[in-house]
Amino acid sequence: GDLSQRHRLVLGEIREHLRQLEARLDRLDAYLRDAMVPYAFAWTLLQTIPGIGEIAAALILIEIGDDLSHFGSAERFASWAALCPGNHESAGKRKSGKTRKGNSMVRYLLCEAANGAIRTASVFREKYRGLVVRRGHKKAIVAIAHKLIRTIWFLFTRRQAYHDSGIDYAAANVKKNAPRWIKALRTHGFVVKLAAAH
């Protein structure tokens, strides 16, 4: 039936609130991009890694910077990020100790990225599948986060983007940027009609 005046008022308020939120997100997005200009290369490198998007890459950069040379090695970098398990061997058996103390924010960000990475067609997903049965989800995620931080180390030291043969980079780029492209086209007066993929 027809909406009452009160219902129309509430819906109008909701629409206005959503419009304000969208405008705020646009401003934050622009601010983020401006802030990342001096670190554009490192920011872009991070986003080539499965599970790491624009926001996560920016937050990671805030914590680690774009020069990792002072860490000296991937192992020290991982240890600093609390992602280097204290492992030792005894009588030919590998025993795992507790993860060392370190930068809890980087550890958190990379564990979140690991949760995203295992959902991509990548080596991270395959490694996770091999670990989760034996170690459980939480320990497997920490192991993936450890692999991610070592990947970051090698990308930054070699100045090369990440490449995984299991990923369709062209399709991933379209999926990632399509909403922004569509919005930009609509802003400039173009009519965008989405068709189902075949």
Give, region by region, the residue ranges found by the protein language model.
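A detector of single, family-specific signature residues
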Residues: 1-198
